[in-house]
From Swiss-Prot:
Primary residence: membrane
Keyword Transmembrane among UniProt keywords: yes
Pfam families per UniProt: 7TM_GPCR_Srd
Subcellular location as annotated: Membrane
Similarity-based family: Belongs to the nematode receptor-like protein srd family.
Annotated source species: Caenorhabditis elegans
Keyword DNA damage included in the entry's annotation: no
Membrane topology, as annotated: Multi-pass membrane protein
Official protein name in the record: Serpentine receptor class delta-19
Length: 339
């Protein structure tokens, strides 16, 4: 069984790393002027998801929750087991902070789309400051959560009591855990990972409905190209909003395991195996919907070894940025600052 999940992590993590690196490159060098400010958020998404995929590949976590108790056991089966337990612990802490930052970033993206319907586009510096402000809670989580992990010598005797039916002594991965989830640092981390997801998700869909209502009410005042361009980016964001449901599933699996509702090694492996799908699939939305990105991807598929050819070329046109099915949607710069 462990072989299957190792292949799963390697496959999805490597795919996610490649797609997010590609998206970062395209957002920096191929973003049209019309979405230059928004490209800041795209780069934020891509960088966060790349780090998350790389860390998932590095640690490959099995989460064994102690049913009915505030305790967790972690088993790391990734390459980090060859670099020391500390690297596994810090790796998990930063992976979890990427998950939370991705959720906040999604909220920023939808909020910005709603904002620019009534206001001029924000500068890239302003968007960067907003992103950093939302990033601080996740950074605090990353810098503190790893300090809670106890060494193998301390967790193994306890884990054998909690799970006598597991042969944990022969476990080849790094064995560690958190023996007190009531600690303030642990409460902060678990709450920050699990609680914001569903309120943020509800807010995202409320914003989506407001944007759709506004576009419908302003349809006679907007040009067809402008409205179509907004609609296409909204579709990209909506698709991207569906993808984090994988994180929601992972959270529900964790609660099921922690509460004792479900108990299975497959469940323990599946929590992080499901979560990796979010950062691995997320970049596809922009690679498909943003026309210059999509055109570049097609050229890469035809000539896979020419990704970095002519990097000095930058997308300068404000037209044809978003795709509608197989046809480009043309718009001019006011699409970013619709009043």
């Amino acid at each position: 069984m462990i072989i299957f999940f190792e292949i799963w992590h390697w496959s999805w993590a490597l795919l996610g790393c490649y797609l997010n690196l590609l998206l970062t490159y395209l957002a920096i060098f191929r973003s049209p002027k019309a979405i230059k400010s928004y490209a800041t958020l795209i780069i934020n998404f891509a960088a966060t998801d790349f780090v998350e995929c790389a860390l998932d590949l590095f640690i490959q976590t099995r989460l064994v929750a102690v049913p009915g108790e505030a305790k967790l056991v972690y088993i790391f089966n990734g390459p980090c087991k060859y670099t020391g337990s500390l690297s596994c612990k810090v790796g998990l802490s930063f992976l979890l902070h990427c998950l939370t930052h991705s959720v906040w970033s999604l909220l920023i993206s939808f909020g910005y789309r709603f904002y620019i319907l009534h206001n001029p586009a924000l500068s890239r510096l302003t968007l960067l400051k907003i992103t950093i402000m939302f990033y601080i809670p996740s950074l605090v989580q990353a810098l503190t959560y790893w300090t809670l992990f106890v060494p193998r010598e301390k967790i193994l005797p306890l884990a054998k009591q909690w799970f006598p039916y597991y042969d944990l002594e022969t476990e080849t991965g790094v064995l560690t855990g958190v023996i007190d989830l009531t600690n303030f640092v642990a409460v902060y981390a678990v709450a920050h990972i699990c609680l914001p997801f569903f309120p943020v998700y509800i807010t995202i869909f409320v914003l989506r409905q407001k944007i759709m209502k506004y576009l419908g009410g302003q349809s006679q005042m907007m040009s067809q190209d402008t409205k179509a361009a907004h609609t296409q980016l909204l579709r990209a964001l909506t698709t991207q909003a569906i993808i984090p449901m994988f994180l929601g599933i992972a959270v529900l699996l964790y609660f099921s395991s922690q509460s004792g509702l479900l108990k299975s090694p497959i469940l323990e492996y599946s929590i992080f195996s499901v979560a990796i799908l979010m950062p691995a699939l997320s970049p596809i939305t922009y690679l498909y919907f943003v026309r210059p990105y999509r055109q570049k991807v097609k050229r890469i598929i035809r000539h896979p070894f020419k990704l970095l050819s002519r990097p000095h070329e930058r997308a300068t046109s404000n037209s044809g940025v978003f795709y509608s099915g197989d046809h480009p949607t043309h718009f001019s710069k006011p699409v970013i600052a619709v009043h």
